[in-house]
Amino acid sequence: MFAEPETWVAIAFVILMGVFAYVGVHRTVLTTLDRRSARIKGELDDARRLKDEAAKLLADYRARHASAEREAQDIIASAKAEAERIAAEAKVKMEDFVARRTKSAEGKIASAEAQAIADVRAAAADAAVAAAAAILSQSVKGQVADDLLANGVNEVRAKLN
């Protein structure tokens, strides 16, 4: 039995464990393991805290992004509505401008037409007066002719103008 190497290894192991127990190596090992466990637990707690902060930041970013998207959509809708309003207003102004210009042109045309009719009537009256004067001066002579001519000319002018 003492000749077996396994026996001496077992005896050496038991003696070594006894020395370790006497010196208090197990307490040192346990203390070191406890410190290491506490450090790892602290690191895990820090990692959990950082993960929670990152999740909060991500949620905040997503909320801000959604808010910015809504605001951008509102701005776009407002700009479209404003553009449509301006276009409608410009169309109304253009139609009003065209209507006023048309009415003004029609007024000018009517005025020119009335002036042309008046000019033609005046020319016709002058021609009729001249023709009547020529006819009367040839057919009637003397003071009666002058009176008739003056009255007739005035009467024709009054009626034709």
From Swiss-Prot:
Keywords: ATP synthesis, Cell inner membrane, Cell membrane, CF(0), Hydrogen ion transport, Ion transport, Membrane, Transmembrane, Transmembrane helix, Transport. The chain crosses the membrane at residues 5-25. It is a single-pass membrane protein. One of its GO terms (molecular function) is proton-transporting ATP synthase activity, rotational mechanism. Its main location: membrane. One of its GO terms (cellular component) is plasma membrane. It is found in: Cell inner membrane. F-type ATPases have 2 components, F(1) - the catalytic core - and F(0) - the membrane proton channel. F(1) has five subunits: alpha(3), beta(3), gamma(1), delta(1), epsilon(1). F(0) has three main subunits: a(1), b(2) and c(10-14). The alpha and beta chains form an alternating ring which encloses part of the gamma chain. F(1) is attached to F(0) by a central stalk formed by the gamma and epsilon chains, while a peripheral stalk is formed by the delta and b chains. F(1)F(0) ATP synthase produces ATP from ADP in the presence of a proton or sodium gradient. F-type ATPases consist of two structural domains, F(1) containing the extramembraneous catalytic core and F(0) containing the membrane proton channel, linked together by a central stalk and a peripheral stalk. During catalysis, ATP synthesis in the catalytic domain of F(1) is coupled via a rotary mechanism of the central stalk subunits to proton translocation. Component of the F(0) channel, it forms part of the peripheral stalk, linking F(1) to F(0). Belongs to the ATPase B chain family. This is ATP synthase subunit b 1. It comes from Nitrobacter hamburgensis (strain DSM 10229 / NCIMB 13809 / X14).
